Amino acid sequence: MADADRDAIAELVHRYADAVVHYDGDQWGACWDVDAHWVLGPGRDVTGRAAIVELWFKAMKMFSAVVQNVLNGEVRVDGDAASGRWYIMEHFRRANDERGILLAFYEDTYVRRDGRWFFASRQLHIQYQGPPDLSGPFQNDWSGR
């Protein structure tokens, strides 16, 4: 894989997070391919850029502030298609003033069109969502193994 492809996909992921922080639907929507697929969670699974942006605005109404940080990630490129996994951490304040943190990762596929990378699909996998002190349950708790 060319470093330029990985860098361009990393920039896409960071542009997405920046749009979340600034509540910028135009910037956020421009990250998606026209026929993309987004799985935000059970019952929140949509296809097509317009439907994806509509779901995003509905989801964002639950919050008054979000800071999304992109952590580590990996990318595998195969021509004009690629896949990857990116870990994120979000600090948020809900509309009811409840504060919390989200630790999760996205499983992604990407497509290159006219020399530019877009999300072809993103699926959110929540590892933790709860109080900032991490006192809530972890979805990936392996302590019983």
Which residues fall in each region the model found?
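Basic/polar N-terminal segments that are highly enriched at the extreme N-terminus
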Residues: 1-7, 141-145
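Short, aromatic-enriched amphipathic alpha-helices that serve as compact interaction elements
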Residues: 5-21
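Surface-exposed helix-capping loop/turn segments at secondary-structure junctions
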Residues: 22-27, 116
